[in-house]
Amino acid sequence: MEGCVGEESFQMWELNRRLEAYLTRVKTLEEQNQLLSAELGGLRAQSGDASWRARADDELAALRVLVDQRWREKHEAEVQRDNLAEELESVAGRCQQVRLARERTIEEAACSRRALEAEKNARGWLSTQAAELERELEALRASHEEERAHLNAQAACTPRRPPAPAHASPIRAPEVEELARRLGEVWRGAVRDYQERVAHMESSLGQARERLGQAVRGARESRLEVQQLQADRDSLQERREALEQRLEGRWQDRLQATEKFQLAVEALEQEKQGLQSQIAQILEGGQQLAHLKMSLSLEVATYRTLLEAENSRLQTPGRSSQASLGFPDPKLKLHFLGIPEDQHLGSVLPVLSPTSFSSPLPNTLETPVTAFLKTQEFLKARTPTLASTPIPPMSEAPYPKNAEVRAQDVPHSLLQGGRQQAPEPLWAEATVPSSTGVLPELEEPGGEQPDHFPDDPTSLAPPLNPHHSILEAKDRESSESRVSSIFQEEEGQIWELVKKEAATEVKVENSLAQEIQESGLDTEEIQDSQGPLQMETLEALGDEPLMSLKTQNHETPGKENCNSSIEENSGTVKSPEKEKQTPLKSLEEKNVEAEKTLENGVLELSKPLGEEEPRMEDQELMSPEHTLETVSFLGKENQEVVRSSEEQNLESLITFKEESQYPLGGPEAEDQMLERLVEKEDQRFPRSPEEDQQAFRPLEKENQEPLRFEEAEDQVLERLIEKERQESLKSPEEEDQQAFRLLEKENQEPLRFEDAEDQVLERLIEKERQESLKSPEEEDQQAFRLLEKENQEPLRFEEAEDQVLERLVEKESQESLKSPEEEDQRTGKPLEKENQESLRSLDENQETIVLLESKNQRPLRSLEVEEEEQRIVKPLEKVSQVSLESLEKENVQSPRYLEEDDHMIKSLLEDKTHEILGSLEDRNGENFIPPENETQGSLRPPEEEDQRIVNHLEKESQEFLRSPEAEEEEEQVMVRSLEGENHDPLSSVVKEEQMAESKLENESQDSRKSLEDESQETFGSLEKENLESLRSLAGQDQEEQKLEQETQQPLRAVEDEQMTVNPPEKVDPELPKPLRNDQEVVRSLDKENQESLVSLNEGGMETVKSSETENIESLETVGECLGRRKSVDTQEPLWSTEVTSETIEPLEDETQEPLGCVDENQEVLTPLERESQELRSLGKWNPETVESPGGVEDSQQCLEVEEGPEREQHQESLRSLGEVEWELPGSGSQQRWEDVVEDGEGQEASLGATGVETEDKAELHLRGQGGEEKAVEEGELLQDAVGEAWSLGSSEPKEQRVPAEPLDDLEGQPEQTGTLEVPVAQGMPEATEQDEDRAQAGEQDSVEVTLGLEAARAGLELEQEVVGLEDPRHFAREEAIHPSLGEESVKAKIDQGLEEPGKEPKEAGALDSGIPELPKTSSETLECKGWEESGEGWGEEEASLETSDHEGSHAPQPRPPKTEEDEGLQAALTVPGPKLLEPCSPIPILTDAHELQPQAEGIQEAGWQPEAGTEALGRVEDEPEFGRGEIPEGLQDWEEGREDSEADELGETLPDSTPLGLYLKSPASPKWEQAGEQRLFPQGEARKEGWSPAALAAQGLSDPPEEEQQGHDSDLSSEEFEDLGTEASLLPGVPKEVSDHLGQEPPVLQPACWDQGGESDGFADEEESGEEGEEEDADEEEGAESGTQWWGPGPSGGGVKVQDVTQRGDLEHESVGDSGLWDDGLSGAAANVLVTALETVSQDSAEPSGSEGSESASLEGEEGQAIDHLDAPQEVTSVVPGAGDTFDISGQGPNLESEQVNGRMENGLEQAEGQVVLHGDEDQGIPLQEQGTLKAPLVGSPVHLGPSQPLKFTLSGVDGDSWSSGED
């Protein structure tokens, strides 16, 4: 036995050694295998990284090259775009020039026609009046002869009676008594006749007053309506701004929220990826450990069984116990060996399991079957799913070795049976514990726990240790039982051990799964995602659905089938992933990362989608908030944690999705509900996992597909959103701009492309999933189809929108790839698509999100939200229209709206720039259009408004980031808009001009209609237009079209009216000229945009005011006593305060509201008022109607201000004064003037004395040369007259200047008077111009002064008489220079005023309107006298000078504002032709008013002359009768109204505290008188005459402004006046070049100077109107030529007047005068030039009026330049020339006054204008306005009176009127 035992022991030891060797070898081999596998994995990773890096580098290099290429292309395109833009601008400028030239030509033609009509009407009326007077004279002579014959007969009879002497006396007594009785009867009859005539005149006056009151009431109502509409507009604008701010705030909030969400999503994504990698590593390690442990345990069991079998055979039963006891050590050894191996594996796992494990692991883990049970083929088959995991090779390596060991030690059959049969018993056992113990919980949540392992290695450790302990215990038990068992039983025991170990493995996995549950894995999601797959596979395999998923999976057929089905599912899911990946790659290279994430996400979805959310939830659980704490909980707590995490994730995802994907919101909400139901049912799962599975199947099916679908979309969207937001957040503004800009173009293509691809991918995924799930779940498909439909419907709806946008965006989206920003934008495009236009623009996000949200989720909700948003964004809009509109329509329309908005915005901007310059109508139309468009835009869907904002942003960003196409498109849009503007304005201008002409005719015809009807109609039309514009806000497209139509209609109407008032395009009449076009187009575009706004506002306001003022002044004429009744002091302070405040207030209001309906209303009102004025003029030729709009308006304002008791008192006083003035117009004026002068002397004496003295001395000196005695006498007379006139007002001083004596003297010295007037006119204009020219360039003044000096020199050379004029002219030049300083100061003041609230603009406007009137009056009157007396030589000189002045003045356009007003007034006056008012109503109102005033002055001077001299009386008698007749009364009232208006306007213009005298330097101001007195001219009253309001006005105006602004300038002006030639260069506003240029065209005078001052605006308007005036001047010159022809001598007066203008623009008026002198054509040209000067001044020599005339054209070029230099002054001068020529001839005093008037007009001081008129016409007692009216009639029938005769003045007044018409 011992040998046997030893042998057996030896064998046993041998076997033990073999076993040890085997185990050692196995261990070494395994270690080597691990090392090799680790090395292999590292090599693989390195190789993969290298290749990937190489590819990435190559791709990056290629992309960089592509980007560089795209950038180069972009830059090239931008260069091309810029070139095209420049070309486009040049073309647009040329088109604008052509259009303006065309418009000017048409307007000039219309003005010429109107002028001709006006002259014809005036001549006809005058002829009728002359005929009536002649008839009356004949009747009187006949009656006188009869009486004489009768008396002679009686006388003859008496001596025949032979009675004795005693009886002789008694006989004689009866005869004497009878004779006395007869004489008494005759006298009484004459008295009765006179009383009847007076009563008739009073009745007519009352009727006129009633009509005026009606017109005033209509104007007030219209103003109230306008104010109300303006308030409404302001409120709407404020509301719109608030809404925009609110939208901006929301946009910012949206940006912040998106940034926060992006950061949160990025953090979650990173956490998710980290958790996924950790889970993958843990699961991989756990799986490998489990596989290794099970394989080792199986091998150990096999070896144990083999050893026990051998021991059982070799050992006796007694030893068996020992043997059995000895085996635990090996087992323990093995066990401990296993643990180190596991630990070692755990350490090796990180190397073996790269992060790539994340996606494949779930697939490998999908099957609960342990890896070692799977055949090697199965593992090999499974390995492909493990992308880069070297684990399967490692697990395969030990298995063959184990198999080899088994093959060596174990019988072949046993091994085969083990392999084949082991799985069944193993699974048999596994079924029981899993179903009984662990599976219920595991199956509750997900059904597939084996797939999920603990998150932490810590979770793996506990199961491993228990597992090992269990194995140890069971192995010990099995070993003990085996020791006592038979060898055959040992095999069964071995298999039992295998089963138990398998069961323990299952338990370990279950425990792992439980821990996963405890750790809060989203088992619900897992079930939802995994359950369907497994259940589908099980159902497809025919397995019972009630069996637990694990049981089914544990079964071998179920295992294999599950593996196959899972692989199929994963493959099907992968295929969509791949497909999706490929299109995504094709979509964008930037989305490569997003695609990878999508791959992972899709793979995760394919795993079960649940894993994705488990991971995210695990991530959140891993987060300190939930992780470790929740991991410790079990069962429901875990489920609750899972729920909370799920809900949080869902909420975060939902909120993110809702913001980013509103369309998905609905499906997500349903999914959430389903998930909640699933959660609730999952909670019930522990009860019956099978039932839960059944219940879950439909839910899972429904949830899985939508969840997969939505999760895939969410992942895609989130990733895209993250990337795009990151990119978009890089520069949200740039992104927004680009996204906005490229949204329609760039985004549409990528959006459509990406949407299509996304749709394709989604459909492929859905189809593939449906195919993979078809057989198992048709119900799921149905449910999912419903979800799909729900999801797809909004998606399709939105995708359709997106596609529409994408189609539009395709072009630029292609370019978007060119630049990284565009690529970012492209990334933003899918965001916008996926966010469904939520990111379309951060601005639109709110509205668009709401729209998309509401439309996708709830169309009703969308309606509500949209309505709210739209209500906020578009208060006027009907939200239902936009909200109810389909997104497709909105999207389709949105691009169209965007384009339209772009067109509209661009066209608006361009139209504003060009048309504002072009015409008030265009500007107003566009002003109406922009609000309409804006409101329309606001009415448009928020997308459209946002798009508009985007368009603005795009335009701005396009400057920096414009893609070539975008720029080209913009240029195209610009071109289209320009073309539209050019064509439309050209065609519309032609039509409008035609309409304007026809309208003017109709107006002249309809002018007889009541103003109320017209105003009501116009206001009704305005209201209709406003209402229509508001209504248009309601309809978007229709509204736009309507707006265009309406705007075109109002534009046409307004243009017609404006053409009548001041052709809007006359604003840039000089633009066509190449130099001035370039300079002035540029400057005028800038300046005119500004100035035109100011000037147009002022012009429109002044025109409105003037119309109102005219209406008021007509009321004033009715109650002209207001002005006259007021002491000059009262009037002046009233003017200063009331007029200033009123003028300033309306100017401010109107200036502030220039762009509003006010402009149209004002323009409409102006034409209406002008028509009413024309009606008045037609009715009575009342100078009232002729009154300048500014004066009228001012007078209206004054009347309104004073309307209370003052009006009544004034009316009474006016009546009394009117009667007195009719009786003694000159004396009354003189008295007033004296009063005013006395009152003003104290104030102004100090101010104006020095300058005035110097000027007076210079003027006297000059006149002394010409004819000091006459000048002195005239000066005295004028002084007296001026005193009265100044006391009466600026107009009265004119009359007084031209009082009978001064007129006689002036007639005697018409040259001197003209000269004096000229200096005044020049001085005033120059003062004004110098202010303007100061702004522009001092050169203008100096140029004009030089021109004036040259003109004066020329005049001196031409005539010695003219020398007197020249002296005045020189004086005027000096004054002009001095006034130019004054004017500059005035302009500076005006500029300051403009800078101020707009009072000064108003003042400037008032001054402009006032100045034109005064200049006309004084210039006309003076022009008549001075012109007549000065002679043609002087007129020629003036004509040349005037032409040069016009040319010189032509340069500066700033003055057109005045001229516009002047021209507007003149045009209005001229248009009515028969009624000067009618021309006055259009634009000529002021000019006519001026001219009429000069004419009135001339008439009044005639009237004064009747007082002063027989000729004056002769001429004046005719005129005075008219003046005193209907016209005189009307003129007086009108002139008083003008005085009031001028005073008011002047007061408004001037600070309340500043005496009018300071501003006006009017005789009213003491300084003026002192200056005038000190300056005493040779005429004796040189003070009045020398300072004669013209000189004073010139000097005074210059002085007051100067004193206020340049106190020293007044002195300088006087000194300068002495040395005007030198001083001209010294003038602050006039550089020497200007003076040098005086002879030449002073191109120096260009709008630049106007830019410098607010007055530039006013004068710019005048200049524009002046340009218009020039255009009109061409007509006027035609008419004026006719007028000038019969004005023949007028040119000299015109020369004098020209000097006035020239000194303001000396050459201008001289040129004008020269035009008149050179020939009748020239005189007409001179008239036109004067008018043109005015117009040119107003035009600022936009086009030299002279140029309109033959020589006046050339001269006007020079004079235009001079005017350009002297713009405003020249304008005034030109106005003065019109009237000034007459004045000059009739009396220089008025001319000086005209200058003052002009100066005042330029300074915005109509008072001076009024004074000039009064001075000229004081004799008649008719205000200049009245005189203007009278003159207008006289113009109608120009009387060729001797140069000394006032009729000449009247004629010159007529010419002035005709000129006014011409100017019109």
UniProtKB/Swiss-Prot annotation:
Post-translational modification: Constitutively phosphorylated. This increases during mitosis when the cytoplasmic intermediate filament network is reorganized.
UniProt-recorded name of the protein: Nestin
Organism of origin: Mus musculus
Region (Coil 2B): 197-314
Region of interest (Linker 1), residue spans: 44-55
Biased composition (Basic and acidic residues): 469-480, 575-598, 609-618, 680-690, 698-732, 742-776, 786-843, 916-925, 947-965, 978-1012, 1065-1090, 1204-1213, 1254-1273, 1384-1405, 1514-1527, 1703-1712
Disulphides: none
Classification via PANTHER family: NESTIN
Region (Coil 1A), start-end ranges: 8-43
Function in brief: Required for brain and eye development. Promotes the disassembly of phosphorylated vimentin intermediate filaments (IF) during mitosis and may play a role in the trafficking and distribution of IF proteins and other cellular factors to daughter cells during progenitor cell division. Required for survival, renewal and mitogen-stimulated proliferation of neural progenitor cells.
Domain of life of the native organism: Eukaryota
Head: annotated span: 1-7
Ranges annotated as biased composition (Acidic residues): 1429-1440, 1532-1547, 1612-1621, 1658-1680
Biological classification of the source: Eukaryota, Metazoa, Chordata, Craniata, Vertebrata
Gene name, Swiss-Prot/TrEMBL: Nes
Residue numbers carrying N-acetylmethionine: 1
Biological processes, Gene Ontology terms: brain development; cell projection morphogenesis; embryonic camera-type eye development; G2/M transition of mitotic cell cycle; negative regulation of neuron apoptotic process; nervous system development; neuron apoptotic process; positive regulation of intermediate filament depolymerization
